[in-house]
Amino acid sequence: MEIVIQEVDRINRLVKKMMDLTRPALNDFKPTNIHQVLEEILILEKGTLEMKEGAFVQVYDPSIPTIKANKDELKQVFLNLVKNAVEASPKGGRVRISTQYNTDYIFRKKQDTLSPHNIVVKITDSGLGITNATMKKLFTPFFTTKKRGTGLGMAVSLKIVENHHGKIKVTSEENIGTVIQVFLPVNK
């Protein structure tokens, strides 16, 4: 029950932030344990996945340090991503959540600004995958493939991750599933 109350408070804070999108973001970054953030989200989504006779598989890297982040904003990102993975999963499907500590970003390009020290949160589902046409519009505000979707989840998630100086990478194969990786810098 305490987590539900915390989530209502968090949503209220996020709504207040979204009401004035023209104001520059005030980054309320504090030391944050990413595993704690993920566990709170999984508690919220566990029932939905269990109704589909599915389960979460968690593989956490114990060496991950705390990061400087806005915990409420990261909860919103991972709630969006985990909820999408749960919705995409077939009956009896598994949603895998893994974390890893990287000391070098192996996909680095010259124009890439990601810190060489980062954590990666990987969310993998076994759904139908994302079509190429949908992939091109994935982060476009108000684009949705859901009947009741607003089309804001992925756009807001990307904006939050970028405000944390991170990146989101999405790979998907039709009829196999989708992998979403969120890279967040570790401030050394």
Please annotate each region the language model reported.
Residues 161-162:
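Detector for a conserved hydrophobic position within an alpha-helical segment of the HATPase_c
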Residues 34, 129-137:
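Short helix N-cap motif at coil->helix boundaries in the Bergerat
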Residues 24-27, 66-69, 145:
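Conserved micro-motifs of the catalytic ATP-binding
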Residues 55-65, 100-102:
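Conserved catalytic submotifs in the C-terminal HATPase_c
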Residues 30-42, 98-101:
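A conserved beta-strand-to-alpha-helix junction within the catalytic ATP-binding
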Residues 92-105:
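Short beta-strand/loop element within the Bergerat-fold HATPase_c
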Residues 48-58, 91-93:
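Short conserved segments within the C-terminal catalytic ATPase subdomain
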